[in-house]
């Protein structure tokens, strides 16, 4: 008797039930998710929305742009204007330290999108001593990335000159005009800088540096009172990551639409494809557990301002139970088996 032949239909049936969406009769329930910026890093959320992956599990989701960084999205979360936010995570940690019941639910990736791009004469990080390094603003994700890289190199912040330029395009102009010797750039701007001949001298992805990027945050009260609804939302969220990683053409088209990049702008479309490749192959994680290691990085930074923060447990700032349930049930594994 062919035992493999017997078990194949059983395996197929199990896969069907694991991925079975919410019944159509279930009323669609509105949830709003706020994004801190318009960025390619939001690709998986846009894909989940555009491909109807939240509706598939009986949840009506509206994706809104809050802007103004993580602090503003956390404020909108606390006010009840949104039920979930996607941002850098530090805002949620700061609010929790003040006693506000925000919580980190997932981290789609935890290694930085920033790279230090330097003028051609700067060969290695050691050549950065005494040089002007541009960031957007103090307290930004790029500023944190720079501080972490300097620490990894056993360099102090006062051994370089940190200057602010407000935006990635402005920093690139600063490099061109010699107003900065290096700049902490993000996607897709560092691809443009590389094309112009600037050199990569620091990349957190290759330096084993973890910090919060693209964290999904919510309120503990919502998680307690609406666990089933949140779990269904999370199914759409993690399936969005899987769809993004597995469907390059459609994902790029959705990002192109959201970023308002016209098809005739070949250079911009090329940079968008490079951004997709980096996100899909290197950054996005299949099982987006909240990263305790990345949370600890933020706590260590904040402990420089308040030593008492060293006593806090990084695990207490996150609720991994939703991702764990989807992981343990085989739901996430099944998404990649299709």
What are these regions (language model features)?
Residues 1-12:
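Bacterial N-terminal signal peptides that target proteins for export
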Residues 10-22:
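Bacterial N-terminal signal peptides
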Residues 27-177, 181-187, 200-204, 209-210:
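Short, glycine-/small- and polar/acidic-enriched structural segments
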Residues 62-65, 269-280, 313-325:
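Short linear loop/turn motifs
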Residues 90, 169-264:
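Pocket-lining segment of extracytoplasmic ligand-binding domains
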Residues 130, 195, 319:
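Phosphate-coordinating loops and pocket residues in cytosolic domains that bind phosphorylated ligands
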Residues 225-311:
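Secondary-structure end/capping motifs
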Residues 299-338:
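Conserved C-terminal helix/tail region of periplasmic/extracytoplasmic solute-binding proteins
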């Amino acid at each position: 008797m062919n035992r493999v032949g017997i078990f194949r239909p059983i395996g197929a049936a199990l896969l069907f039930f694991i991925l079975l969406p919410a019944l159509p009769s279930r009323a669609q329930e509105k949830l709003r998710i706020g994004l801190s910026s318009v960025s390619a890093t939001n690709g998986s959320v846009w894909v989940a929305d555009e491909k109807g992956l939240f509706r598939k599990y009986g949840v009506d989701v509206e994706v809104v742009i809050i802007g103004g960084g993580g602090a503003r999205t956390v404020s909108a979360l606390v006010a009840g204007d949104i039920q979930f936010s996607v941002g850098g995570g530090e805002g949620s940690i700061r609010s929790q330290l003040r006693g506000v019941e925000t919580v980190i639910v997932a981290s789609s990736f935890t290694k930085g999108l920033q790279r230090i791009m330097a003028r051609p004469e700067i060969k290695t990080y050691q050549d950065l001593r005494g040089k002007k390094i541009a960031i957007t603003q103090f307290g930004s994700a790029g500023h944190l990335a720079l501080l972490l890289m300097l620490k990894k190199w056993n360099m102090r912040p006062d051994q370089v000159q940190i200057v602010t330029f407000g935006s990635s395009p402005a920093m690139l102009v600063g490099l061109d005009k010699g107003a900065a010797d290096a700049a902490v750039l993000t996607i897709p701007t560092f691809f443009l800088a590389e094309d112009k001949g600037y050199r990569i001298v620091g990349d957190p992805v290759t330096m084993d540096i973890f910090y919060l990027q693209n964290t999904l945050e919510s309120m503990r009260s919502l998680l307690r009172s609406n666990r089933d609804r949140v779990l269904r939302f999370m199914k759409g969220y993690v399936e969005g990551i899987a769809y993004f990683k597995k469907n390059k053409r459609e994902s790029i088209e959705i990002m192109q639409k959201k970023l308002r990049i016209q098809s005739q702008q070949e250079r911009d479309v090329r940079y968008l494809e490079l951004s997709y490749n980096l996100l899909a192959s290197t950054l996005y994680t299949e099982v987006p557990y909240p990263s305790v290691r990345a949370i600890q990085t933020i706590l260590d930074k904040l402990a420089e301002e308040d030593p008492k923060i060293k006593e806090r447990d990084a695990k207490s700032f996150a609720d991994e139970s939703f991702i764990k349930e989807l992981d343990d049930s085989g739901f996430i594994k099944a998404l990649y088996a299709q």
